[in-house]
Amino acid sequence: MEEKFLEALAAAWEKAVALGVRIRPVTDMAGVHRVLSGHRESDGFFQLADQGRLDLSMEALAVKKQFTMLFSDEEANNALERLLTAGYTFK
């Protein structure tokens, strides 16, 4: 499942880069966990928010039903809080 998450993240970031969003790629789950457990949003988060494309953020992927088991409650809550604070609406 971790591999599927990383593939989905790479695909989302490829789309984000095509939109002109500058992202420093995270290529392993340790890096993903570090970002989600930290106090800062993932790279490109605010640029994606400005473009109405938070669906391409690491945070949005982390709270998708198929990936939630990969993350601690704290990480999932951090991701959800960041998204909601930025005005993200779930489809």
Language-model region placement:
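Amphipathic alpha-helical binding modules
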Residues: 52-91
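Amphipathic alpha-helical packing elements
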Residues: 3-54
